[in-house]
Regions:
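Outer-membrane beta-barrel strand-turn architecture
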Residues: 1-3, 92-98, 160-163, 227-229
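Surface-exposed loop/interface segments of Gram-negative outer-membrane beta-barrel transport/assembly proteins
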Residues: 2-85, 101-218
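Short strand->helix junction
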Residues: 109, 242-243
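Structural motif corresponding to the C-terminal cap of alpha-helices
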Residues: 160, 179, 211, 225-227, ...
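Structured alpha-helical segments in the cores of large, soluble enzyme domains
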Residues: 217-227
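Transmembrane beta-strand segments that form the barrel wall of outer-membrane beta-barrel proteins
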Residues: 233-241
């Protein structure tokens, strides 16, 4: 059987980790720095005992939040992604000109995102707090995604040469299916800022989760005929169905 059966396979694994600021996109440092007025100081200025203007303890702001405040105080977002890929092939020679083949592949993808943003307070240039500070809250979230995609295919190949006549035929079956699930949770008012876990949030409990799956099944076939190395006829048939 060893001279009739051929087995091959390949696997790959990726483990990816990224840590970024808690705010991104239009609320991120780079976009805010493009929109922030260059005439504003980094910190609000106040006079010292000698009448000179020096930095206060409060960040300045304009029509948008101070990008440096976001850089230093916006918290973090951690993204962990793992991907496992595998593909396996088998080919069995039944008799001369007749082979059966099988291919199976799987892709396993997982992603976890942890985000924590402490409350960032804003003050007027005279040091008085904005009224919006009263509603400011710490925010923590965690989301998880699991995806598994699989493909299975069987083929039966026939090839025969009789004199100058060449006959070929193929019958096949394939199926692809995927299972996907998500789970997420958010909380506000984190009890201890250094402990970034969902259970540390005290109010505004919000949870979400989804699960879905799909499948695609196909049957296909082909018949071809050639004479003296020239293709004269070929017919193909395929039927697909999905869930």
């Amino acid at each position: 059987v060893y001279d009739r059966l051929k087995l091959t396979g390949q696997m790959s694994y990726v483990d990816f980790y990224k840590k970024d600021l808690g705010y991104s996109g239009t609320s991120g440092v780079f976009r805010l720095s493009q929109r922030m007025s260059p005439l504003l100081p980094v910190m609000w200025q106040i006079p010292d005992e000698n009448g000179r203007m020096v930095d206060s303890e409060n960040w300045s702001y304009g029509s948008v939040r101070n990008p440096l405040q976001v850089a230093y105080e916006s918290g973090m977002e951690e993204r962990k992604t793992r991907v496992l890929n595998g593909i396996f092939n088998a080919d069995l020679k039944i008799i001369d000109g007749l082979n059966v083949g099988m291919q199976y592949s799987a892709n396993i993808y997982t992603r976890q995102v942890d985000e924590f943003n402490p409350k960032m307070l804003s003050y007027y240039s005279d040091g008085s707090p904005l009224k919006a500070n009263e509603d400011a809250k710490d925010y923590i979230s965690q989301s998880h995604l699991d995806v598994m995609t699989q493909t299975l295919q069987f083929t039966l190949n026939f090839n025969k040469t009789i004199g100058r006549h060449e006959l070929g035929a193929l019958l096949g079956f394939s199926q692809e299916w995927e299972n996907r699930s998500t789970l997420g949770a958010t909380r506000d008012n984190v009890m201890v800022e250094d402990i970034h876990v969902i259970s540390a949030g005290m109010i505004n409990f919000m949870n979400s989760g989804t699960k879905d799956e799909w499948a695609l099944r196909s049957y296909f076939g082909r018949v071809n005929y050639a004479f003296d190395g020239k293709y004269l006829f070929e017919a193909n048939l395929r039927a697909d169905g999905t869930s």
